[in-house]
Amino acid sequence: MRREAGSEAPDDNTTRLLREQVGGRLLNEEEVVSIVRNWTVGELGTISASVGILAHYLAERPELQQQLREQPSLLPAAIDEILRIHAPLIANRRITTKAVEVGSRQIAAGERVTLIWASANRDETLFGDPDEFRLDRDPSQNLLYGAGIHVCPGAPLARLELRVVMEELLAHTHEIALVPGKPPIKAIYPASGFSSLSLRVH
């Protein structure tokens, strides 16, 4: 329908995808649907996982929770750091476009590889103690939203949504705590976050 609408189609990301060319040809319908599905599912799944991860992390750390209530300007850095420690997206698959060496391992062009973002964001050579929460880390080292040509196109929106959710949650509560006797149940790979999380909010 959008292609048929021509110049009457709304000027949005989907319409721009329909005009996008790769190697001199327009993307076909299957490619456009795949991209839009990845954007949508990636957004919904990772945002919901992220909110659970953030709430759980703060429920376990009342001092940090209170600090962020009193200094909401710290939230953007705190959110990125918490999600570096507990990644909402564990891994992604890629196909190498050229031969590359990673560590001492040779990988030929055209190989299928799995990138473990959660592991990269806990690399001791970059982050020292990867479990230590620090607001002064170099944000360019954090691969929460990927990097290069595969950087998440929704990163600015995701950051905005997470900041607003946490601002509102902290502004309208004075305590977020775990429910005694109801331990959280972690999601099963390839998902992240929690499949069940009980919190008491006052």
Where are these regions (language model features)?
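Cytochrome P450
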Residues: 1-202
